[in-house]
Amino acid sequence: MSYFPWLTILVVLPIFAGSLIFFLPHKGNKIVRWYTIAICLLEFLIMTYAFCYHFQLEDPLIQLKEDSKWIDVFDFHWRLGIDGLSLGSILLTGFITTLATLAAWPVTRNSQLFYFLMLAMYSGQIGLFSSRDLLLFFIMWELELIPVYLLLSMWGGKRRLYSATKFILYTAGGSIFFLIGVLGMGLYGSNEPGLDLERLINQSYPTTLEILLYFGFLIAYAVKLPIIPLHTWLPDTHGEAHYSTCMLLAGILLKMGAYGLIRVNMELLPHAHYLFSPWLVIIGAVQIIYAALTSLGQRNFKKRIAYSSVSHMGFIIIGIGSITNIGLNGAILQILSHGFIGATLFFLAGTACDRMRLVYLEELGGISIPMPKIFTMFSSFSMASLALPGMSGFVAELVVFFGLITSPKFMLMPKMLITFVMAIGMILTPIYLLSMLRQMFYGYKLFHVPNKNFVDSGPRELFLLICIFLPVIGIGIYPDFVLSLSVDRVEVLLSNYYTK
């Protein structure tokens, strides 16, 4: 067992090192860029070393535990620890954030503040995935909003302030329910509030209170995930934000909602989750179809990709609602798979938009001729998104399918109906993605574009794309590498679940 504070270092390093950006010499943006990338690489290397040498995969319990008294008056502790559920999300955060800083290379306006906000976001995300105290979890959840709001409102399209305001209103509204749930859970049955997750797992509640707590947390997570009808901030935000910010939103921020749903609702409130799980499966199936049909009607290709993200989140919801080992592992696999694929699609959309200065599909066409590398990578990641066999999206969705089919909670006819709806959603996915590719890259409208001096992907962009493409292919060919991280922890979670 390691007593070195690995997780505390991982949480505080980005934001503290990021604050030094403002003291760097003002000799252009190059120093700031290289400094930020160096911090992200150092963080990722420390993370990889700590997990390789101090984390035991076969142990399903919480590891790398840290427990220090923080605020003595409230008996508030700094509790950190990780298990198989959080390990993959932390590694995904490190990988995507490092590449997002590389993607943000062209940012020159207020670059010091931009990179600092990215690093502050990094700290908040690592803190959330590794927290073992519900109040600390909530604090990290809220701290995340500040850098995201500033990144959305200061860098992006013409309507960026509108989209940032919409984002903060939705998420802050959900956080009110989150805070009420945290207070209710901490104060119930005790004069002294205690929010240690280890203690809360063994806490029992009256049925009505448990349902109310579950519903309050669900609203907060439904905004972040997002779950319809609380999803409307997402297309506006992705349509206006800078593409490096979109990578962090699609790759990590949406996954925080799914992680919270597993970590808090499923682990701490099993009775309520058992009651709500059929509704989660129904909502997930409806979301797959609704978002796919809505995506098909979008003229803005950034918003089309945003709605495809909403559709793919439906598989995560179904996996969580299935209450099976296979289904929950499939949901975790989909979290990681979509983290890679979604982030890259938004990066490609942003780089293409920067070159063309156009976002409406009817104005595009024929750009595969001057930009063959972007066309090749866009096509490859679109194939991954539509679940082409051999890529991570296919394995994740297939495992969720099997999880639903083998679920003992549902009768045969409802399972067949939900599976049929999911299959229709999988058929709609190639329709809206391939039609987008056809409208963007084929045809003869290239000559109507004002700026004809197109430049194809450079070495930096190709390096970034290949770095993400390798794990997408790797997971598709050998998914057990990722499933082995969570399978033991999921088994323990569900065994406790059914005994309760």
UniProtKB/Swiss-Prot annotation:
Coiled coil: none annotated. It catalyses: a plastoquinone + NADH + (n+1) H(+)(in) = a plastoquinol + NAD(+) + n H(+)(out); a plastoquinone + NADPH + (n+1) H(+)(in) = a plastoquinol + NADP(+) + n H(+)(out). It is a multi-pass membrane protein. It comes from the Eukaryota. One of its GO terms (molecular function) is ubiquinone binding. The keyword ATP-binding does not apply. The chain crosses the membrane at residues 4-24, 35-55, 87-107, 111-131, 134-154, 167-187, 211-231, 242-262, 274-294, 313-333, 334-354, 386-406, 417-437, 462-482. One of its GO terms (biological process) is ATP synthesis coupled electron transport. Its EC number is 7.1.1.-. GO terms for cellular component: chloroplast thylakoid membrane. Keywords: Chloroplast, Membrane, NAD, NADP, Plastid, Plastoquinone, Quinone, Thylakoid, Translocase, Transmembrane, Transmembrane helix. The keyword Transmembrane helix applies. It is found in: Plastid, Chloroplast thylakoid membrane. HAMAP family: NDH1_NuoM. NCBIfam families: NDH_I_M (TIGR01972). Belongs to the complex I subunit 4 family. This is NAD(P)H-quinone oxidoreductase chain 4, chloroplastic. It comes from Saccharum hybrid (Sugarcane). The gene is ndhD.
